[in-house]
Structures are given as C-alpha cells and as structure tokens.
C-alpha cells in the first residue's frame, strides 16, 4: 500500500530507508492484508542479538514493533524477506481471534521454569509458522530439517519414531495451533507425547 512508508516511525534512516529496505517491508505486508487492516503503526528497531529478533503488539494491538538484527541486512534480500515474512506471520497470528493470543500470559512462577516453558512455546510457534509458510511454498527462516533438529534437542528423551510423529503433526497441522494449546503443550510433556497418539483430549 502506497501510504505504508508514512506509518514507519523511529527508524534509523541511515540503517534502513536510505538503503531501500522499506521495500522489503512493503512487499512482505502485501502478503498480510489482515495486518494492514488492523495495525496503525509499524516500528522497526534493532535487535541486539539474533536471538532477540522478534515482534510484539503494543498499544492495545494497534502498533507492531519488529526487532531485526542489523547483520541480517548484510546477508541480502532473500534472507531479509524470509525473516520479515516469518515475523509478520507471528503478528498475523496475534491479531487473529482464533489464535486466542494473550499478551499477559504468565508461563510459570519460578524464573527457571518460566524460561524453559517460554522456550518450548516459542519453538512450537516457530514450527507452526514455518510449517504453514513452507506448505504454501513460501520461503521462511528455517527449513523442516532445521526445526526438527531444534525439536529433537528439546525433546531428546522422547523416542525417535514418536518424536517424528509429533513434529509432523505440528508442522503439517491442518488447523492453527492456538496460543492456549501451545501453552498447555509447553507446560506438560505428557500432552506433547499424547499428540503422537492423535489424542485431542491431551
């Protein structure tokens, strides 16, 4: 949309606009008409590390903050497009009422448990997003093999065959895996295991 650039605020022009990177965002937004309809402002900020890349909804869901790692822009246009597409899919889920996103979710009472559950939750969401994008024939930040490797490292105690079944269900899920469902799975490995049996009561 032609008015998209005026929505961008607080950008480091040297880092972003003068290098023509706004075009990548415009192209990516064209893939997500739902975001353009709902969101009033998009802020692009620098992520301090690759792990800190991500997106957040603020101001009651009217503003998006996308954090991108500066080195991404050295890697070239394809990688920029992949990362932005992946991040905007997170945003698209957040504004989709069927996803049941809760920005105030408290994952656990202790910091260590919070970190473990949050990391699992993020992995499930990344698998869900990259699976949907890959199944549409779109390039994204990680391949099936890469996400499977991450999944294996998180759930190494689950037997290989069972793990493959569970991962496949997440990657090829016909219906969106909701926020609440991912929180449940992140908190309880038995519920993750139950996915292999196809249990909907898990």
How would you name each of these model-derived features?
Residues 13, 17, 72-76, 80, ...:
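Conserved aromatic-histidine-acidic binding/catalytic patches
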Residues 147-202:
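Pan-zinc metallopeptidase signature
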Residues 78-99:
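Active-site recognition of the HExxH zinc-binding catalytic motif
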Residues 94-127:
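Post-HEXXH active-site segment of zinc metalloproteases
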Residues 2-64, 115, 136-137:
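Auxiliary, metal-adjacent structural segments of Zn-dependent hydrolase domains
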Residues 122-134, 168-169:
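Short, hydrophobic/amphipathic alpha-helical patches that form generic packing surfaces
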Residues 133-150:
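Short helix/loop segments within enzyme catalytic domains
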